[in-house]
Each structure stands twice: as structure tokens, then as C-alpha cells.
Amino acid sequence: MQTYPEILDFFMTLFGSILTDIREKTPLVHHMTNYVTVNDCANITLCIGASPVMAHAEEEVGEMVALAGALVLNIGTLDTLQIDRMFIAAKAAEKYGIPIILDPVGAGATSLRTKTAQRMIQELSISVLKGNAGEIGTLAGKQAQVRGVDSGGVNGDPTEITCGLAERLSCTVVMSGPIDIISDGSRTLLCENGHPYMGRISGTGCMAASVIGSCAAVTQDYLSASATGVSAFGIAGERAAVDAAGPGSFKCRLFDSMASVRSDDVDRYGRIRSV
């Protein structure tokens, strides 16, 4: 692992063991996600070694969550019925001690998305909050630019904003970007793995949340789970881009590359540093 200063020793041990545990335990990861990228999220979850399920019916979401190792909530194609179902699922996750990963897609773009995401972080025990700079900045109360589901940036220091929000919410926060920022309020990591093609296809942010959810299903150290997921997904992106002719072939190769990432690859190829 390349570190710029030295990363803490326990991270180096956990990263590899998390990927190994996913392949050995194949945890169920329950998604309540958007209909644009739902198939991509299911496939990337399978590729890392976990098992996806996408149950949305009010009558079964609580039961399904009880069987899962993690719950991923994604507000990319939001409506009022889905909001109610997400809260039912989240309350079940809290009851059974199951980690909740929230991807507040488009928070800051419309009042529905912003208010829903704000309500979720206020009323639910979120384990990992993952979003782009605009989304995280909005939820941190900063001036941010969000166009649709794309980030236009945030005013202020991104690392300080991420760390401050994590401390306030008592959860792990991931701000995605060219350099991903991962913080639980007291420990902060920067990850530089990835490739520009990842920003040229739809769904990579959603897929990253699925990978993080898969990692969070096998450890209670959600900072390590997030860093492992972000780095492993970024490494897969780097490998997929090597022979890709463009974004289309890159997307196909991304799934193959994710399936081939091994437990020691994050240690060998992860570009992670602590701050």
C-alpha cells in the first residue's frame, strides 16, 4: 500500500480481511435504490462476492432487512411512497443492528431530495453517508453546487467539511471525487484510486455505495469498510481502463475487474493516505 505519511497498521490488516470475509460469507446486501442503476448495483455486488436483493414492497422490506448484512438506501429516483418504504426498512435495520449506507443522490438539487436526505440523517442511525462534494456539502450546511445528480463543487475545504459532518452525525462520511475523502470524525483517509472513465458512465457512484455496503456487512469498523470499498472499486476502475476503447467497453470490463480484485490488492495497489 502506498502511504504518504504512514497509514495506521490496523487499517492494513483490516483491508485484506474485509475482502476475504465477503468472499467467504457472501453477505446479503439489501438495496432500496433507483431504477436507473439497479442492475449495475446488483452486478457489482455479485462481483465483489456479496449477494444483492432489491426488495421494495412495504409488506416485505422489514422482513428482508432482517436477513441482510447491510442496507443501502439510494434516493436517485425518489417519490413519496419510496420514502415511506425506506424509513420502514431503515427502522428494521436499526432494530436488528444492521448498518445503513445512505447515498443522498441529488441532495441540494431539489427541495424533495434535500429535505428527504436531511430527514434521514436526522432521524436514522446512518453508518455510512456517501455522496459527491455537492451532496455532502449541502448536508453539511455549506454552499454547494448540484446540477441534477452531478456535483458542481462545494465552498470550503472538502476534508474539513467531511470530517466535521462525520463528527456531527457520529458516522462515517465519504465524499467522492478525484480524491475520495473518508472520515469518521476522528480518523480521516484520502484515497486516490480510480480513473476518469468512472465519471463518464452512469451509475459508478451508486455502484460504489453497493461495494461499501458489501464491506460494511462483514465489519463494524465502517471507516475501514468504506476505505476498502472505495479503494477496491477504484483499483477495478484503473484495471478496466487499460484495454478499454471508451466508456462502453470500460463499463463491461469494470465488472470483470471488480470480480478479480483480491484481498492483497488493496494493500499492494491502494493509494491511500491518512491526514
From Swiss-Prot:
Top-rank taxon, per record: Archaea
Binding-site positions, ATP: K130, S176
Protein name per the record: Hydroxyethylthiazole kinase
Role according to the record: Catalyzes the phosphorylation of the hydroxyl group of 4-methyl-5-beta-hydroxyethylthiazole (THZ).
Gene designation: thiM
Keyword terms of this UniProt record: ATP-binding, Kinase, Magnesium, Metal-binding, Nucleotide-binding, Thiamine biosynthesis, Transferase
Recorded family membership: Belongs to the Thz kinase family.
Family annotation (CDD domains): THZ_kinase
Catalytic activity: 5-(2-hydroxyethyl)-4-methylthiazole + ATP = 4-methyl-5-(2-phosphooxyethyl)-thiazole + ADP + H(+)
Its EC number(s): 2.7.1.50
Essential cofactor(s): Mg(2+)
Binding locations of substrate: M54, G203
Biochemical pathway: Cofactor biosynthesis; thiamine diphosphate biosynthesis; 4-methyl-5-(2-phosphoethyl)-thiazole from 5-(2-hydroxyethyl)-4-methylthiazole: step 1/1
Biological source species: Methanospirillum hungatei JF-1 (strain ATCC 27890 / DSM 864 / NBRC 100397 / JF-1)
GO MF terms, alphabetically ordered: ATP binding; hydroxyethylthiazole kinase activity; magnesium ion binding
A biological process from GO: thiamine biosynthetic process
